[in-house]
């Protein structure tokens, strides 16, 4: 019987040699255009380096990622004809995936400028615990806190 081939995962990006930057590039990518996505992300990192001269852009990115990543979320479960929102702890891989998704979403929703500028602004805001993506994380945490009474219904 043939052995099952396991996927290689995400390779680190070329400039920073960091897997999480590569995952952000993959999250920003549309229609398979990875070069365009990489140009957007690296442009955002250059903008961060220009505006925050005292800090490394990779450190700002990591701090933004940790500030946006949710620790708990609510999941729906049907119990006896009623649907409850049950707070659940978020696994590390999903935590990062949600953070990338929210950063991209709220960067896209910002007004006017180029995507690199919008992404840089969202990352800098998230690093300083401001911005829409951090508000989304806080909202998810509030929902989990409000439904703490249903925690005993865990899956």
Curated annotation (Swiss-Prot):
GO term, biological process aspect, one: translation
Superkingdom, taxonomy of origin: Bacteria
CDD domains the record matches: uS7_Bacteria (cd14869)
Listed Gene3D superfamilies: Ribosomal protein S7 domain (1.10.455.10)
Keyword rRNA-binding assigned: yes
First and last residue of the signal peptide: none
GO cellular component, one term: small ribosomal subunit
Family named by the database record: Belongs to the universal ribosomal protein uS7 family.
Subunit composition and interactions: Part of the 30S ribosomal subunit. Contacts proteins S9 and S11.
Record's function text: One of the primary rRNA binding proteins, it binds directly to 16S rRNA where it nucleates assembly of the head domain of the 30S subunit. Is located at the subunit interface close to the decoding center, probably blocks exit of the E-site tRNA.
Protein name: Small ribosomal subunit protein uS7
